[in-house]
Curated annotation (Swiss-Prot):
Name of encoding gene: proS
Species name: Citrobacter koseri (strain ATCC BAA-895 / CDC 4225-83 / SGSC4696)
Chemical reaction(s) catalysed: tRNA(Pro) + L-proline + ATP = L-prolyl-tRNA(Pro) + AMP + diphosphate
Gene3D superfamilies, A to Z: Anticodon-binding domain, Bira Bifunctional Protein, Domain 2, YbaK/aminoacyl-tRNA synthetase-associated domain
Matches recorded under Pfam families: HGTP_anticodon (PF03129), tRNA-synt_2b (PF00587), tRNA_edit (PF04073)
Coiled-coil residue spans: none
Entry superkingdom: Bacteria
GO biological process terms, semicolon-separated: prolyl-tRNA aminoacylation
Name this polypeptide is given: Proline--tRNA ligase
Residues that span the membrane, as ranges: none
Length: 572
């Protein structure tokens, strides 16, 4: 490709509304342009990267035995009503009616569509297992699209769905997809972790996220410093402390705390160690409970894990925090004065709270706290559960080492769905015993557009993007200095351009009438891994300057050796 025949829409300045580095560089490198909130046009440079990501995904899906299909973006509402997700999915599901007043949705995912297809196409266990995938545009009406294509409303996704007659068969496919995902992200040159995860709104039994490690990530990735244990923050278990509860050394006293409505204020004003404080959160109780609310207690320096809390049998799903009005009507005190002593609703405490002694908590009286509270002396020990987020330094749940926490960008997610959708949509086949058998399902997603942004978040410097070779828009940049004035530079540039292309190498030759500084800046900005610079001074010695984008190292290569050198560098 020649720049004179190409749309190289680079920008010198960073757009003001671009928050994260990937969004900034994708705009500056001429990869994308914003059409509307959360909607982007992919320009040629960006599309080349996107297609390379897509091709790697497709190759590994094929290698794993998945079968490619293509399903409609527009889906009839009755399928979503049949599955129960019409009400559950919320405002991210874009709903509309056609001219006949028939309701439809723009598909954010395709569990319903593929299950409907399978229930009409398959009849016998002999046809299974099967695993179908597509790479297709999805739409989710995000309330606040942000970070460019990282959290856009329209995006390209690879979604796959497998069907089985046994858990053992599902596990085999799940393991194969786990391995395929690991190959995909390894081929792309990404630093990633596969972590255990909660199944969330998709539902099901088991789940893993694939997280690209990056400071700009929205997720906390938890892993051991001494083993392969890895999980996301929602799933990671906070191990119960091994040390027994210390004996009480203080009497419980009622203290006036009129200006301490938060743990931070309590600690500061009364010089308390935060590890000796407890915070109390009230949430809605499950429907049918004899109490409207449930009290959840975590140590003052810990955070409630809402996913874990929602799974408690006493707690309503989705987890809903009580309003101040609801709290005052029941407890007769505000949210800043709550504690376990004389709490009129069921209490669940975190494992760490269970081993605390001589601690401080609200007295359920406005402007007052109890200091020196001890379990079983001042208040009975309530139900104990793991309801907090882990913190760095916690022991690893597998007993090996301690936990580290890094930020991550979720680029893939695999689920063992079980029979959630097949039961709802009555997808079954005749089993080996001749009886009707509900199918067991798995689903496997990769955010193809998100992978592009995640790769940039991991691969950039002060000059621009530093693409991993496998997904770079071009493999080689040819920069002929003053080619429009030097016949030999122009002649050699054309010769090398043709020879490299004949070797199957993707080349961008900058044949613009631009200053060398502009040419260098643009090629470094868009991140082409290998650059050769042709100039009269070096050609006097039969040399060509080669530069590797990742480390910036330069070397002189003889003109007769440059093609073989590049072929070896790229193809090995």
């Amino acid at each position: 490709m020649r720049t004179s025949q190409y749309l190289l829409s680079t920008l010198k300045e960073t757009p003001a509304d671009a928050e994260v580095i990937s969004h900034q560089l994708m705009l500056r490198a001429g990869m994308i342009r914003k059409l509307a909130s959360g909607l982007y046009t992919w320009l040629p440079t960006g599309l080349r990267v996107l297609k390379k990501v897509e091709n790697i995904v497709r190759e590994e899906m094929n290698n794993a035995g998945a079968i490619e299909v293509s399903m409609p973006v527009v889906q009839p509402a009755d399928l979503w009503q049949e599955s129960g997700r019409w009400e559950q999915y919320g405002p991210e599901l874009l709903r509309f009616v056609d001219r006949g007043e028939r309701p439809f949705v723009l598909g954010p995912t395709h569990e319903e569509v593929i299950t409907d297809l399978i229930r009409n196409e398959l009849s016998s266990y002999k046809q299974l297992p099967l695993n179908f995938f597509q790479i297709q545009t999805k739409f989710r009406d995000e309330v606040r699209p942000r970070f460019g294509v990282m959290r856009s409303r329209e995006f390209l996704m690879k979604d796959a769905y497998s069907f089985h007659t046994s858990q053992e068969s599902l596990q085999e496919t799940y393991d194969a997809m786990y391995a395929a995902y690991s190959k995909i992200f390894s081929r792309m040159g990404l630093d990633f972790r596969a972590v255990q995860a909660d199944t969330g709104s998709i539902g099901g039994n088991a789940s893993h996220e694939f997280q690209v490690l990056a400071q700009s990530g929205e997720d906390d990735v938890i892993f051991s410093d001494s083993s392969d244990y890895a999980a996301n923050i929602e799933f990671a278990e906070a191990v119960a402390p091994k040390a027994p509860r210390a004996a009480a050394s203080q009497e419980m006293t009622l203290v006036d705390t009129p200006n301490a409505k938060t743990i931070a204020e309590l600690v500061e004003q009364f010089n308390l160690p935060i590890e000796k404080t407890v915070k109390t959160l009230l949430v809605k109780a499950v429907e049918g409970s004899s109490y409207p609310l449930v009290a959840l207690l975590v140590r003052g320096d810990h955070e409630l894990n809402e996913v874990k809390a929602e799974k408690l049998p006493q707690v309503a799903s989705p987890l809903t925090f009580a309003t101040e009005e609801e709290i005052r009507a029941l407890v007769k005190a505000g949210p800043g004065s709550l504690g376990p002593v004389n709490m009129p609703v069921p209490v669940v405490i975190d494992r760490t709270v269970a081993v605390m002694s001589d601690f401080a908590a609200g007295a359920n009286i406005d402007g007052k706290h109890y200091f020196g509270i001890n379990w079983d002396r001042d208040v009975a020990t309530p139900e104990v559960a793991d309801i907090r987020n882990v913190v760095a330094g916690d022991p690893s749940p597998d007993g090996q080492g301690t936990l580290l926490i890094k930020r991550g960008i979720e680029v893939g997610h695999i689920f063992q769905l079980g029979t959630k959708y097949s039961e709802a949509l009555k997808a079954s086949v005749q089993g080996e015993d001749g009886r009707n058998q509900i199918l067991t399902m798995g689903c496997y997603g990769i955010g193809v557009t998100r992978v592009v942004a995640a790769a940039i978040e991991q691969n950039y410097d002060e000059r621009g993007i530093v693409w991993p070779d496998a997904i770079a828009p071009f493999q080689v940049a040819i920069l002929p200095m003053n080619m429009h004035k030097s016949f030999r530079v122009q002649e050699l540039a054309e010769k090398l351009y043709g020879e490299l292309r004949a070797q199957g190498i993707e080349v961008l030759m900058d044949d613009r009438k631009e200053r060398p500084g502009v040419m260098f800046a643009d090629m470094e900005l868009i991140g082409i891994p290998h650059t050769i610079v042709l100039g009269d001074r070096n050609l006097d010695n039969d040399d060509i300057e080669y530069k590797y984008r990742r480390n910036g190292e330069k070397q002189l290569i003889k003109t007769g050796e440059i093609v073989d050198f590049l072929v070896k560098a790229i193809k090995g």
